[in-house]
């Protein structure tokens, strides 16, 4: 377990806050983005404990307005600062925070940590959670134990890895969880404790994100209509939802198996926990049949995380075999 045992010790790394909008920057009766980076920092007295703190506004949008270009811009700004040894905190709308954080982890290639946080309640609301989350995030970004961990999500006093974090509650102040792994640590009285780490994956550096990668779920009674419609739109890749532990109706599996000969088709399990099995079931359309095709199992990643990673892989020019290898790093 790694912890800051000497609580009088000053932060080991200077921190840069990059703001991208979201609820944490919203005020007023209708909760519109208002606070820029300077305004956000000025509203949180607890940040005075951190010397040489920088704050830069990258964007000021609600999550639903973000584009892939916006997300890539935020991630590059964070990565560039981390390459200079600066700890980074990104404040971000929570609705798609996990997506941008995952993309950032795919790009991140430095030792300094990048930490995402946000808020459930606007800055002007009673009991606003943004200030505490921001102080906790800066504490983690400034700490020695967080070095080399990649991209983290700090929310509600918990520390999660970007590859595992999901928004699992719309209104709880502990809105994020990691169903597959649980949190990696906690922040208590402003001091981070990290009790587990996840191996980092080799980074990618896509020049832009201009590919089409939809998420296509499966349901009982699926007759392949949605699959055929999705493929008719000429996607560059597919994130495929399977039932249980990698199961599909046989006729639907055949459609996706044919598609996987031409484009990357990456499969996830509908349950929030668990991975595509290897050889437990043997009926038609089971995981044995799926793994006998060129469909790529995604391991423990959520569909949103898979999409961001697959977008980065395809946009960086990886072929299907290289994409398969990239996702094998997360496959149980």
Name each region found by the language model:
Residues 1-80, 254, 273, 297:
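ATP/NTP phosphate-donor binding region
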Residues 2, 9-14, 18-25, 30, ...:
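Accessory alpha-helical/coil subdomains and C-terminal extensions
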Residues 28-31, 101, 126-129, 161-167, ...:
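Short acidic, glycine/serine/threonine-rich loops at helix termini
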Residues 85-97, 233-244:
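Short acidic, glycine-rich surface-loop motifs adjacent to enzyme active sites
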Residues 91-112, 248-257:
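Short Gly/Thr/Asp-enriched flexible loops that form oxyanion-binding sites at enzyme active sites
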Residues 250-332:
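ATP/nucleoside-binding phosphotransfer catalytic cores, i.e., glycine-rich phosphate-binding loops
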């Amino acid at each position: 377990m790694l912890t800051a045992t000497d609580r009088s010790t000053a932060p080991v790394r200077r921190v840069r806050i990059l703001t991208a909008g979201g609820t944490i920057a919203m005020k007023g009766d209708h909760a519109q983005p208002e606070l820029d980076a300077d305004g956000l920092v000025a509203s949180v007295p607890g940040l005075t404990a951190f010397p040489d703190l920088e704050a830069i506004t990258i964007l000021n949008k609600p999550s639903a307005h973000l584009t892939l270009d916006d997300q890539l811009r935020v991630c590059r700004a964070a990565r560039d600062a981390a390459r200079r040894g600066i700890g980074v905190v990104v404040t971000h709308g929570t609705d798609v925070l996990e997506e941008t954080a995952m993309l950032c982890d795919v790009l991140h290639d430095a030792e300094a940590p990048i930490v995402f946080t946000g808020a459930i309640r606007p800055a002007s609301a009673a009991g606003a959670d943004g200030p505490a989350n921001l102080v906790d995030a800066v504490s983690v970004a400034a700490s020695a134990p967080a070095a080399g961990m990649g991209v983290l999500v700090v929310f509600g006093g918990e520390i999660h890895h970007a590859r595992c974090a999901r928004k699992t509650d719309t209104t709880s102040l502990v809105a994020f969880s990691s169903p597959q792994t649980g949190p990696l640590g906690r922040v208590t009285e402003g001091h981070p404790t990290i009790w587990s780490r996840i191996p980092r994956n080799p980074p990618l550096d896509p020049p832009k994100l201009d590919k089409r990668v939809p998420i296509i779920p499966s349901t009982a009674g699926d007759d392949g209509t949605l699959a055929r419609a999705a493929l008719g739109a000429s996607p560059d890749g597919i994130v495929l939802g399977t039932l249980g532990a990698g199961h599909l109706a046989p006729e639907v599996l055949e459609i996706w198996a044919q598609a996987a000969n031409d484009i990357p088709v990456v499969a996830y399990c509908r349950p929030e926990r668990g991975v595509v099995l290897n050889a437990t079931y043997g009926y038609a359309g089971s995981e044995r049949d799926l793994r006998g095709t060129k469909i790529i199992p995604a391991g423990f990643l959520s569909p949103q995380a898979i999409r961001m990673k697959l977008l980065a892989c395809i946009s960086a020019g990886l072929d299907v075999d290289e994409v398969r290898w990239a996702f094998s790093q997360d496959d149980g």
